[in-house]
Amino acid sequence: FVILNKKQRGKVMFKKMPVCRLMISCPSDVKTEVEIINRVVDNINDSIGISMDIFVKTLYWSKNVMPEAGNYPQSIINKQILDKSDAIIAIFGNRIGSPTQHYESGTIEEIELMIQKGKQVFVYFSDKPVRKSEIDMEAETKIQAFKEKYKDRGIYVVYASDEEFNDYVSMHLTRYLTTELANEVNRVNEHTRFDDSISQRKEVDLIYDYTKFYDI
């Protein structure tokens, strides 16, 4: 490594990059999909993230939630992760998850709250082959009811394999980020026409409906 003298150290600067906080929400039966999302995000950060000066940070309850007394578990997750997230990826396999105070499951509550906040929502349903012994008919009924509720809103995609899920997530996140960064640059340029002293925001609110560019 290189040792810098005081004069040289004074010139070292770290680049500030917009950060997209991406929440991962799912029941416990889609662990493979969570791993895929993390790999896709790593690839994005190493490719277009570097060229476009943006960093995607994934947030997942098992890694990013600290114990907190006095509140319901879902309220803690909402406070520590959801309220700070710019977008959410939700995945359903064969389970719908544990119920909360107000919704059928924690994942459904997180989807609903992000929609209410006007944030970006990506929802994926697995159609991968399943053993009969793993099928939960009650959960399946609830999942189908949830899909029926949102079918006209175009907020979800069905995938049939891990490879297809990987391709969907990579495509949707890439287009989402590039579109939002382009929109942010346009917003900044529009403002600077009237005020040359304005500085670009450190973080970008990433809100975009990917169904506008992808035909589900």
What do these predicted ranges mean?
Residues 3, 8-216:
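Conserved catalytic or regulatory cores that recognize and/or transform ribose-phosphate-containing ligands
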